[in-house]
Each structure stands twice: as structure tokens, then as C-alpha cells.
UniProtKB/Swiss-Prot annotation:
SMART domains: MutH (SM00927). The keyword DNA damage applies. Disulfide bonds: none annotated. The gene is mutH. Belongs to the MutH family. This is DNA mismatch repair protein MutH. The keyword Nucleotide-binding does not apply.
């Protein structure tokens, strides 16, 4: 299977993304010789990976933007018939130790959300995976209010992590950004700060954007 060359510039990236609008996942997969899974229970990242491949994203699972040379992160977002997001959006793994001196400005969350290409995809369960169509893409940059909310949530969450209170953080914390266990396997462990300042083992956590926030982004774009 021939790899897609990364887009040279923003215009080319947007052209590629717009060309996918209205196309089904089965059509994209067939063009690439990829088998469509019956469901996404075991292939949760399949849709995102397919679209990354079609657009020529380069980051893979590396901690950087998908189109680093363009300063753009790619995010697929499953939506219902009303165009509302069906689930929270994963941003990146949260650092749980060695966080001294880490600020919002040099955080991975800030880096990833500088500029995002949102690609909505039909996500209703009654639509088979292959029949789900891709929507119109949105190139988004957080405005000052959105940035303030993101920074505020990130700083509050990181402060609790630094105080060794990671276990007390629930998905309800944060207005727009939340912290949740990341690993599919609950036996996966990573180091985190304990309340007495030592290190302890806990499940890895990830930062996620809440659906109310992503719904706001879609509403602003589509009205």
C-alpha cells in the first residue's frame, strides 16, 4: 500500500480534507486496501487512523502535532444526527511525575490544541462502520476565552497532580478539560506523585476535551 505524502501546506491539507466530505469510511478503506471492522469495540482508534492515513499525517503516536510542519493537530469527532459530539475527545497522556517547572505554555495540551483540524464523522451505532460518512472539516484555533478556560482547567488539574491527589480527580473536574484513566488495560501502571511527595504506581491518565466544549466548536462553525 502506497503511503500518502504529507501535505505541503495548509491549503493542500484543507483541500484533501474537503474532498473527503460526504464520502463513506468504506470508500476510503477500499481505496487503501483496508478491511473495515464490524464494530469499533476492539478498534477504537480505527476511524482516526484511517483519516490520518488518507490526509498524510506524520506523527503517529508521537507526542507532537499530527502535521508538525504545518502546526496542525488532527481530531476526528463522532457526531449524532443532530451534529452533536457523541464522546469526549482525547488530547494526550497526562504527566503524573517529574512535573516541576511545567507550565501551560510548554505543556503538550497547549501544543496540541494550538490549531486543530476537526473532521466530524457519523457515529450513530445503528449506522454500520463502513456506511458512516465523513463531514465537512473545520480548522479551529482557540480564541482568548477558550484558551483561558483550557489553561485554567489544565492548571487546576496539574496542581492536584502535584499535590499527590490524582486519585481524587474525576471526570467531573474541569469545565472544558477533564482527566481520565487512559489505559485500555486497567493493570497498566505508571509512576505518579503521592500525597507525601514520594512516588507511587497508578493507572495512566489522559486529558480529554468535554463534549460541551467540542459541541461549542461545532456550533460556531456550522451554526
Amino acid at each position: 500500500m502506497k503511503a500518502i505524502i504529507p501535505p505541503e501546506n495548509l491549503t493542500e491539507l484543507l483541500e484533501r480534507a474537503n474532498m473527503m466530505a460526504g464520502v463513506s469510511l468504506a470508500q476510503i478503506a477500499a481505496n487503501r486496501g483496508i478491511t473495515v471492522p464490524k464494530n469499533l469495540k476492539r478498534d477504537k482508534g480505527w476511524v482516526g487512523q484511517l483519516i490520518e492515513m488518507e490526509l498524510g499525517a506524520t506523527a503517529g503516536s508521537k507526542p507532537e502535532q499530527d502535521f508538525l510542519h504545518l502546526g496542525v493537530e488532527l481530531k476526528t469527532i463522532p457526531i449524532n444526527v443532530q451534529g452533536k459530539p457523541l464522546e469526549t475527545t482525547y488530547v494526550c497522556v497526562a504527566p503524573l511525575s517529574q512535573i516541576e517547572g511545567l507550565t501551560w505554555e510548554n505543556s503538550l495540551v497547549c501544543h496540541k490544541l494550538q490549531r486543530v483540524l476537526w473532521v466530524p464523522v457519523e457515529g450513530e451505532r445503528q449506522i454500520s462502520v463502513g456506511a458512516r460518512r465523513i463531514g465537512t472539516p473545520i480548522l479551529w484555533q482557540p480564541d482568548p476565552d477558550e484558551l483561558r478556560l483550557l489553561q485554567q482547567d489544565w492548571e487546576e488539574i496539574m496542581e492536584l497532580i502535584a499535590l499527590g491527589k490524582v486519585e481524587k480527580l474525576t471526570a467531573r473536574h474541569g469545565e472544558v478539560l477533564q482527566l481520565r484513566p487512559k489505559a485500555a488495560n486497567s493493570r497498566a501502571l505508571t509512576q505518579s506523585i503521592a500525597e507525601n511527595g514520594s512516588l507511587k504506581m497508578t493507572n495512566p491518565r489522559g486529558f480529554y476535551l468535554k463534549t460541551a466544549f467540542t459541541a461549542m466548536i461545532l456550533n460556531k462553525a456550522f451554526g
